[in-house]
């Protein structure tokens, strides 16, 4: 879908660039596939702030998305494409041959009326799901499982995809958007195609209020605080903070590596931090 620009009739419209969602369904979601979503505002059960700069967002209902695609060899027709406030991608409502309704992530080039199916050996076309071991090398995929049967975890946000670049001893080699190359079991399911809404990265909110609608409150810089509030606080006049950037609790930030799961290091063939050649 294309981007939508606006005439500068007000200050908030001047810089505004949003995704044109005119092709999406304009009604309410399927009630049996939704549930209420409680807005915490960054507070815990004591009412204390545990996540700063959150709160005041628009009320949402959660849509149940089928990330597992366990209904094998039963074709489904795309009823409509919908907006989902809980994610950056669009979602598709599909109706199986037996009448069951389900939501899936909508890939690019999937239209209303198309047919999708999940199975061990199905056609390589957008929306179809199958094990990585049965896909041709070079295929573009999304919603990739990391453990068989767990449900898709990799490449689920707007415009995201991974590419199957090879196989090795029962494992599939994936190249991710970050540049990382990773081993995943060939039995893991993935869906063909790239995720919808690739223009999401080009939007411009135009005004602070749009961030507030999404629950984002003003993020105060450490150098603007007092010494009691932040390691960068205080000083006469404006200062640079005087040290490498840290969090309010003194932990290094802005580039400090935080990955500590050594058990899965063996599955990373090429780190996303390696210099691009």
Swiss-Prot record:
Gene3D superfamilies: 2.30.30.30, Nucleic acid-binding proteins (2.40.50.140), Ribosomal protein L2, domain 3 (4.10.950.10). The keyword Protein transport does not apply. One of its GO terms (molecular function) is rRNA binding. GO terms for biological process: cytoplasmic translation. GO terms for cellular component: large ribosomal subunit. Pfam families: Ribosomal_L2, Ribosomal_L2_C. Keywords: Ribonucleoprotein, Ribosomal protein, RNA-binding, rRNA-binding. InterPro entries: NA-bd_OB-fold, Rib_uL2_dom2, Ribosomal_uL2, Ribosomal_uL2_bac/org-type, Ribosomal_uL2_C, Ribosomal_uL2_CS, Ribosomal_uL2_dom3, Ribosomal_uL2_RNA-bd_dom. It comes from the Bacteria. The keyword rRNA-binding applies. Residues 222-277 are annotated as: Disordered. One of the primary rRNA binding proteins. Required for association of the 30S and 50S subunits to form the 70S ribosome, for tRNA binding and peptide bond formation. It has been suggested to have peptidyltransferase activity; this is somewhat controversial. Makes several contacts with the 16S rRNA in the 70S ribosome. Belongs to the universal ribosomal protein uL2 family. Part of the 50S ribosomal subunit. Forms a bridge to the 30S subunit in the 70S ribosome. This is Large ribosomal subunit protein uL2. It comes from Bartonella bacilliformis (strain ATCC 35685 / KC583 / Herrer 020/F12,63).
